[in-house]
């Protein structure tokens, strides 16, 4: 525990407070003076009146009370908390016994009118009881009788009831104690010693046996059996078993008595009332007699362990029941005859009615000649599914034969056979060769070489096919006015320039290329001057360079995916 060091001034102040407190408690009168009854308003709001008196200068409480109050508040705020309190603080010493409890205890006492013999017997019992209680109290710790304290695990003392006990000397000394073996009677008990002897000259009355102080040594069963006083009753032999053959019983009655055939229901077991054994009060000596006499085992008296018997083989219930039924000599009795009905219950109409004798049926001989019938062809029960359906006759198809023929032909030849025959037309290009040049004529055609003709036609066809495969030309952009004027000037210059080479010097291939290019230009609606590079393949170097420069200058800025000029679209002014 930590010690709290206090200021010496505080200790001095608290000592003064304690002195004032002791004076105050010493001067308390035994009966408090009846003070003025406060009004309900004053009792509830006493703090407000006290503040008002303090403001006016009137001090209601004395200096001692104020000092005590301030010291108490200081102690509660700064001092360590107490873990326990004294009995005086809890007001446990001031509790007085209640008068109603005494009245209830007095009411519990019962009064009886008894004879003189019963009274003397009661006094003897009380004397023996007080002696036993005094011996028991010596061992127990002594408790000082003082003011009532809260019980700490000890039960409260019970209020004792005074009840007279009637004793009959003619009855046996001990009450029969219920035991497992009803036939065996317990041995006689020893007599008790008398603690208090009451002698009367007139008559001698028997005294009850007292409880011995020392525990008696239990005797061995062999020595006890030798005594002539203790008579051991002979064991009753069980009745001899009766043979089953002597008892005439039917098969049904044997089944009813059998344990296997008896139906055990849950309700029947629950409804059987259980016999409750009333436990009577057993005395100390009786409990000693009931205990088994166990002596410390010695080497001589120690019994030899018996060898365990082999477990009996369990026979199933069904087999044992069947064997017992086969071994039993049961005679089946005939069905008992029904008793006759009494005359009062008989019906007069039924008795008068006579039963008619049964007439045997007549045997009639029928001489009927049956005609001969044709043998019937029995159809099989299981009909075939194919015969039951009537399928129409169809024409035989040559599909399989054609398939076999097609499989023999190779795949390449199949494709050629499936192609449609086209009419061979002469190409239009050699027919228009005469229109290529106005002044000059081709020398190769005059000679009439057929081989050169065929070669030229094949080349022209290949050129035409290549042109078809080319991607479509992008649309031209819209040309502005200054560009258009510039193009017109260039076109005029190109027309005025003289042709350097004659058309005679051009080859047939160049002429064919020129014709195909002119057709493409007409189809696309383009200017003829733009494709001047293709037409003049065999021209001089000066002419080709001049044409390239003109094409580069006149080439418009065309985007392949757009049809308008570059830049955003111009919007008309909305606010004019």
UniProtKB/Swiss-Prot annotation:
Biased segments, Basic residues type: 561-576
Topology of the protein relative to the lipid bilayer: Peripheral membrane protein
Biased composition (Basic and acidic residues): 191-206, 544-556
Region (Interaction with the F-actin capping complex): 547-576
Species name: Saccharomyces cerevisiae (strain ATCC 204508 / S288c) (Baker's yeast)
Listed name of the protein: F-actin capping regulator BSP1
GO cellular component, one term: actin cortical patch
Residues with Phosphoserine modification: 46, 79, 88, 185, 220, 309, 320
